[in-house]
A protein has these predicted regions:
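Active-site loop of short-chain dehydrogenase/reductase
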Residues: 8-9, 80-82, 127-141, 174-177, ...
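Conserved glycine-rich cofactor-binding loop
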Residues: 16-18
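Substrate-binding pocket helix/loop in short-chain dehydrogenase/reductase
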Residues: 96-97, 104-109, 192, 203
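Active-site helix of classical SDR
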Residues: 120, 157, 165
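Alpha-helical segment proximal to the catalytic Tyr-Lys
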Residues: 125, 170-171, 231
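C-terminal helical subdomain
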Residues: 174, 181, 197, 201-233, ...
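Short C-terminal tail/terminal secondary-structure segment
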Residues: 234-256
């Protein structure tokens, strides 16, 4: 069944590039009115023009609660409401644990974890009025499911998002607001593309499906959580990694 979000309003944080842009594109194609929320208003507007379907850009910094409150207020004013929040904004600068500074830790935590809190808190007053409010977090397999060297701070924030989600889903249930999370594996984004073709081939070889994911793969997973078909789903995760977390020994056994 093809999910439709025709006429519903959606805010996507970090929606001007990478996974966020993929989510925004899939939602726009499903008929939603998409607000691209990012610190860089010019980038947001450029993506909105590219998407069409009534999409528009909104300036908002997830590290500031006041900024996110202003952004969600603008989305509500321009759309006449807010039905879906995709809390996607995140950063992942590599840093080895022994060499990591407090400033590096704080930068990742402020964006990925506190930014999720700010985005959700700012959206709640409007989602409550929707009577079918949806929150979709972009988490990761790194942290909640597995580890990856050089991203201790990132993994901690992504695991923290799920702890936040599992408590928030209980508090928000009385408003008929659901909150779920998509856990991407290795997805082709600007960041991964910058690591070179050899690195991409190595990563793809480690995936049972023998390819890297596309941003639209994450967009379609998020679309399910935002759809009416997922009305009875909350506090849950969906891993989208091509089978990457399956132990190599089990994959080898399956191919025997």
């Amino acid at each position: 069944m093809t999910q439709s979000l025709k006429g519903r309003s959606v805010a996507v944080t970090g929606g001007s590039k990478g996974i966020g842009k993929g989510i925004a594109r899939v939602f726009a194609q499903a008929g939603a009115i998409v607000a691209i929320v990012t610190r860089h208003a010019d980038q947001a507007e450029a993506v909105a023009r590219e998407l069409g379907h009534g999409a528009f850009g909104v300036s908002g910094d997830v590290t500031s609660l006041a900024s996110m409150e202003a952004a969600m207020r603008e989305v509500n004013t321009r759309c006449g409401g807010l039905d879906v929040l995709c809390a996607n904004a995140g950063i992942f600068p590599p840093a080895k644990l022994e060499e990591m500074t407090s400033e590096q830790w704080d930068a990742v935590s402020d964006t990925n974890l506190k930014g999720t809190f700010h985005s959700v808190k700012a959206a709640i007053p409007y989602l409550k009025k929707s009577n079918q409010g949806r929150i979709v977090l972009t988490s990761s397999i790194t942290g909640p499911v597995t580890g990856f060297p050089g991203w201790t701070h990132y993994g901690a924030t992504k695991a923290g998002q799920l702890g936040f989600m599992r408590t928030a889903c209980i508090e928000l249930a009385k408003y008929a607001i659901t909150i779920n999370a998509v856990l991407p594996g290795n997805i082709i984004t600007e960041g991964l593309a910058g690591m070179g073709e050899e690195y991409q081939r190595t990563m793809a070889a480690s995936v049972p499906l023998k390819r890297l994911g596309h941003v639209d793969d994450i967009g379609h997973a998020a679309l399910y959580f935002a759809s009416k078909e997922a009305a009875y789903v909350t506090g849950q995760t969906l891993i989208v990694d091509g089978g990457q977390i399956i132990p190599e020994s089990l994959e080898a056994l399956a191919q025997a």
